[in-house]
């Protein structure tokens, strides 16, 4: 004991004289711990079950879509004989790819030159005889409607109903594609008219 009456070493309490803890309190503590643990496990299991059910539902949906796709593919006739062609392996380096592009470029240029060569005589036709969209009476009235302020979409729909090309409104200086046919029809009409006049 020190001067204040406190023990120097140990608690200074005789444990043999200390009363025991009540059994009811021990049972209450154990019951509370068990209840808390069981509630936590129940909640954890319910959350896991919900997630597993959603995953299983998604898997079922995927299986149904796959079965529908398989049925649609099986309904297409002659699909078993189709083979995938033209699949190229990726080039290992950039060098060979550049060489192949250079090697394939000259034939393309040559083909373009050969295609451009026969088209040159066609463009040598006199520009005065070419019927443009603005000069054609069928398209001229639609161009006037555009200038007045009529909606373009309505005009194009009307042109499509009448069998005309609505894209020609954007290029009024372009040549009418069926102008030659129209000229031939006019010539035929003139010739038939002259024959009828001779017959009279």
Curated annotation (Swiss-Prot):
Alphabetized Pfam families for the sequence: CCDC53
Keywords: Coiled coil
Superkingdom of this protein's organism: Eukaryota
GO BP terms in the entry: actin filament polymerization; exocytosis
Coiled coil recorded as keyword: yes
Record has Coiled coil as a keyword: yes
InterPro entries xrefs: WASHC3
Coiled-coil segments on the chain, per record: 56-76
Region entry Disordered, spans: 87-130, 165-200
One Gene Ontology cellular component: WASH complex
Similarity field: Belongs to the CCDC53 family.
Subunit note: Component of the WASH complex.
Listed name of the protein: WASH complex subunit 3
Species for this entry: Danio rerio
